[in-house]
């Protein structure tokens, strides 16, 4: 995923896409071997979302939240997905979960919801 993000930041989107596709295969394998890990589901959600499959990404995020409802990464990224898919009220619900964490994820999502920042993901 890191390599894909790096390519993306340099505008090399085709290379980034290939890295995300490779990461997705590895994450699916990892999830089969060790299921029900919130972090793995977060990465699966992120990777599928980056590949443009928002519906699948949302499913992974929601599975992760069933395991760990206060997972900062999942709540932030799911909130971003909701903003991108024009479901602001759902994004605000994710923000509400993060409000007491005093964390970067809260600030990032708030800025995106408020329109002060564009999601980089």
Language model segments and positions:
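Register position in tetratricopeptide repeats
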Residues: 9, 50, 84-85, 112-119
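Structural marker of alpha-solenoid helical repeat scaffolds
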Residues: 33, 67, 98-101
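Start-of-helix register in tetratricopeptide repeats
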Residues: 39, 73, 105-108
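Terminal, low-structured helical/coil segments at or just beyond the last alpha-helical repeat
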Residues: 90-121
């Amino acid at each position: 995923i890191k390599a894909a993000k790096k390519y993306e930041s340099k505008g090399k989107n085709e290379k980034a896409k290939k890295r995300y596709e490779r990461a997705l295969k590895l994450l699916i394998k990892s999830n089969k071997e060790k299921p029900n890990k919130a972090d793995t589901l977060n990465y699966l959600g992120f990777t599928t979302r980056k590949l443009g499959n928002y519906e699948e990404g949302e499913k992974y995020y929601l599975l992760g939240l069933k395991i760990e409802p206060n997972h900062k990464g999942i709540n932030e990224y799911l909130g971003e997905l909701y903003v991108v898919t024009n479901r602001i009220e759902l994004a605000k619900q994710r923000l509400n979960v993060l409000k007491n964490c005093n964390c970067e994820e809260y600030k990032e999502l708030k800025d995106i919801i408020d329109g002060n920042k564009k999601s980089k993901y």
